[in-house]
């Protein structure tokens, strides 16, 4: 298949739960990509965790063959993209490989915050956008109102939006006709020299690294020698093919097509997402612009509960890193938890997903330290540092100032919940930038410190709006702030794994909460245990776990008082010695519970 005018590369963009994976299922079913008995819900959500949570995490690709009403056969390459703000990087990669997008909006809920974020990315990529209104068979559906919303908020004419119900299959043929008639084909190939964009890569235990590519110019064939332009690595192509969504071997991919190839690549580092792949013998002169890499914004430590599992954790992280280019890690050690890894994530959902995948796919039992963000530290000697681990915060006397990251958040909420949402944003040190109404929904834009978001903001936002608020954010600026390191001491010894960096106004509240929680979690011992929260050398909160008292007089039935006194003195001396030399063992379960996110 060489004629590019019969190819359409498109992605589906939508907010979570607006039905894009269901629409993808219907398109596959309609085009005969899978037989009826092979169909399952959310075909393209390959991970169990995606199906259980009802979210798309990894962008997936599928080639559909469609016989249009004009009599021609078209080849449609669909990129199913995630909707959650944490996985915007996956969306950006999918959009770069396509020329058009289907904008799916739930006709019962209207435009949501994350719909906006993804649409703006599509517009930046010069996409032709076709609005699709889903769930029109529900009683609460308001298609005319939602069309007006799309026009008012996004600025796209939605008067000819396709009305569908992905669940019951209404209007699927109209969507396919809109893809063929309204979305543009790939640009004509300007050269015969191979130039391909590396869109994604994942690890297959039998084939090694499988690479997903969009061919821009030339052809990719079996047995040719290719070069990765970012790393200058050279490989021989072994298999070439595409997904329907089953794997199909085709031996060649032409310009404009999206497919995969394998080349016995074992090195994870050689597959840089956004890299340009070219022919080793006739390389192209200029690499493709690639993608702007997404930098991690939330960091935490991952430690195995059993130190013998460290090597297993190391291998597991290396394999996950291949499937997830936005996830970073480096080795670190903690006096309380042993050797582990400091990991960087795009957000809290991303952190949870990685944790759950390590647990399910690699059978690892992990301890996760409290999440933190990247702070900029300006020292008195003129040096500037970036730290994300509170344990790295050195002598406070040498620090001139500290800056924390602020985000620009867009929140859309029904007006009856607006008061509760505004109170939450104010409590989190937010600054209101804009406030507008679209029908009965409020759109508010706030500037918020990222430090406040990573704990429990998302859960509390959903809670105070009964699940109706939607939230999207992007990094804004770094600003000076009164930040302090909150340390936790158990019997005078600082526990590095429980240290956090907080705003001075929140330090006492958070310190007290941690002390109370640890008091409930650490088992009583033979001596009193002091749990203290400190800022530098100043103690700001304290809780005491009272000692267990062994009854040494239980065997004295009456008798001389001096005998009893002697036993009590002996016990007192033993406890004094224990206080002097005894180490308090904090059980792993106490750490896990104390570090639980969102229990503040």
Swiss-Prot record:
It catalyses: GTP + H2O = GDP + phosphate + H(+). GO terms for molecular function: GTP binding; GTPase activity; guanosine tetraphosphate binding; ribosome binding; translation elongation factor activity. InterPro entries: EF-4, EFG_III/V, EFG_V-like, EFTu-like_2, G_TR_CS, LepA_C_sf, LepA_CTD, LepA_IV. It is an enzyme of class 3 (hydrolase). GO terms for biological process: positive regulation of translation. Keywords: Cell inner membrane, Cell membrane, GTP-binding, Hydrolase, Membrane, Nucleotide-binding, Protein biosynthesis. Its EC number is 3.6.5.n1. It is found in: Cell inner membrane. SMART domains: EFG_C. GTP binds at residues 17-22, 134-137. Disulfide bonds: none annotated. It is a peripheral membrane protein. It comes from the Bacteria. One of its GO terms (cellular component) is plasma membrane. Residues 5-187 form the tr-type G domain. Belongs to the TRAFAC class translation factor GTPase superfamily. Classic translation factor GTPase family. LepA subfamily. This is Elongation factor 4. It comes from Rickettsia felis (strain ATCC VR-1525 / URRWXCal2). The gene is lepA.
